[in-house]
Amino acid sequence: MYDFLTGIIKTIAAGYVGIDVNGIGFRVFTPNPYEYNQNDQTTIFTEQIVRDNQISLYGFKTVKERNLFQKLLNVSGIGPKSALAIIAGGDRDGLIAAVENGKPKYLTKFPGIGNKTAQQIVLDLKGKLGDFSKNIAPMKNLLENSAELDDALAALVALGFSSKEVNKINPKLASLGELTTDAYIQKGLKLLTK
């Protein structure tokens, strides 16, 4: 088992990076391989998964990200690809707040997570994620958004804005009343690009 790999990023592809560690190339599946730059020296914190026909390495920028991945793997019905997709969603604080406040509906916005799996995540992880975020209480307003606003916030994160930036404008967008997803995105872009 490997705790971390330090080396030079040689390959960046959809879903993984190739890291050269002293002449040995490791393929490491990551939530967002495009966070890395080719030919940069970096450290990737890894989790090795052994299956009947495959040994895979999953890598993360921080130890906290890897620990969250490990917690998600303990949920019945969540495999490495689903856990990676959840982390790739970039909304760690929203995920933690939804679990800690018992709001499975919010979790269905992550790829591959339906109602049943979302309920299982809340059931299995509630009370076990407090060490990942100290600011859970202020996140409650995030959980009371309309589906349109939730979709718009997720789209803004997908466009490259950080979850922190998007969560900061959430109250302003929510105060606008009921709008379409497109309208929320347009208003959000204006607020974020000021």
Swiss-Prot record:
InterPro entries: DNA_helicase_Holl-junc_RuvA_I, Hlx-hairpin-Hlx_DNA-bd_motif, NA-bd_OB-fold, RuvA, RuvA_2-like, RuvA_C, RuvA_C_sf
GO molecular function terms attached to this record: ATP binding; four-way junction DNA binding; four-way junction helicase activity
Start and end residues of each stretch annotated as Domain III: 144-194
Alphabetical keyword list: Cytoplasm, DNA damage, DNA recombination, DNA repair, DNA-binding
Region (Flexible linker): 139-143
GO CC field: cytoplasm; Holliday junction helicase complex; Holliday junction resolvase complex
GO biological process assignments: DNA recombination; DNA repair
Family assignment from sequence similarity: Belongs to the RuvA family.
Self-association state and partner proteins as the record states: Homotetramer. Forms an RuvA(8)-RuvB(12)-Holliday junction (HJ) complex. HJ DNA is sandwiched between 2 RuvA tetramers; dsDNA enters through RuvA and exits via RuvB. An RuvB hexamer assembles on each DNA strand where it exits the tetramer. Each RuvB hexamer is contacted by two RuvA subunits (via domain III) on 2 adjacent RuvB subunits; this complex drives branch migration. In the full resolvosome a probable DNA-RuvA(4)-RuvB(12)-RuvC(2) complex forms which resolves the HJ.
Protein name, per record: Holliday junction branch migration complex subunit RuvA
Organism whose genome encodes this protein: Oenococcus oeni (strain ATCC BAA-331 / PSU-1)
Taxonomic lineage: Bacteria, Bacillati, Bacillota, Bacilli, Lactobacillales
